Amino acid sequence: MQEFTKLTGVAAPMPLVNIDTDMIIPKQFLKTIQRSGLGKNLFDEMRYNPDGSEIPEFVLNQPAYRDAQIIVAGDNFGCGSSREHAPWALLDFGIRCVISTSFADIFYNNCFKNGILPIVMPPEVVEVLMEDARRGANARMTVDLEAQTVTTSDGQSFPFQVDSFRRHCLMNGLDDIGLTLEKAASIDGFERDLATLRPWV
């Protein structure tokens, strides 16, 4: 998993509330177990017309936001079904951070496991960040996980809180497999001791 320490990138404003996982990645794209390739179908029904042409009004189709790495979202982002394809699609598009007033619990947890930082902020702060994001390509926010701050393009800085264990995992690029491998020596030692103490097992 890619490390997350400090990110400076374009922030896309998505004020719509209750963006669910089916909106993030529709069900017809869930047949794959590959994490790559889903970015082209991120927000598919919001990005494309039935004939496959782009909907120009959708934020990620606008030139200023095509390379966005941050989303400033409306309340209750990631609600709906528990599909892990949702963070996969966001990450494959290039999104590394989502800021909202609240997230669905399962989506929130899945983000951390896939290298995305979900940040919960008070409504008044999210509104400031949303307005900054509306400045287009000039809205290059900085998300500093070590300092736990979000800084707008005009220098306003806002603190955020994140669980220390999740922060450690993101900053060191540790998913579940990586965490297990960190303990490989201890696991090997336990297995050797177990074989000596309980050879019949």
Curated annotation (Swiss-Prot):
Record InterPro entries: 3-IsopropMal_deHydase_ssu (IPR004431), Aconitase/3IPM_dehydase_swvl (IPR015928), AconitaseA/IPMdHydase_ssu_swvl (IPR000573), IPMI_Swivel (IPR033940), LeuD (IPR050075)
Pathway membership: Amino-acid biosynthesis; L-leucine biosynthesis; L-leucine from 3-methyl-2-oxobutanoate: step 2/4
UniProt record, GO biological process: L-leucine biosynthetic process
Record has Lyase as a keyword: yes
UniProt EC number: 4.2.1.33
Pfam families recorded: Aconitase_C (PF00694)
Catalytic activity: (2R,3S)-3-isopropylmalate = (2S)-2-isopropylmalate
GO molecular function, one term: 3-isopropylmalate dehydratase activity
One Gene Ontology cellular component: 3-isopropylmalate dehydratase complex
Record keywords: Amino-acid biosynthesis, Branched-chain amino acid biosynthesis, Leucine biosynthesis, Lyase
UniProt superkingdom: Bacteria
Function: Catalyzes the isomerization between 2-isopropylmalate and 3-isopropylmalate, via the formation of 2-isopropylmaleate.
PANTHER family associated with the record: 3-ISOPROPYLMALATE DEHYDRATASE SMALL SUBUNIT, 3-ISOPROPYLMALATE DEHYDRATASE SMALL SUBUNIT 2-RELATED-RELATED
Protein family membership: Belongs to the LeuD family. LeuD type 1 subfamily.
Subunit structure: Heterodimer of LeuC and LeuD.
NCBIfam families the record matches: leuD (TIGR00171), PRK01641.1 (NF002458)
Protein name: 3-isopropylmalate dehydratase small subunit
Gene that specifies this protein: leuD
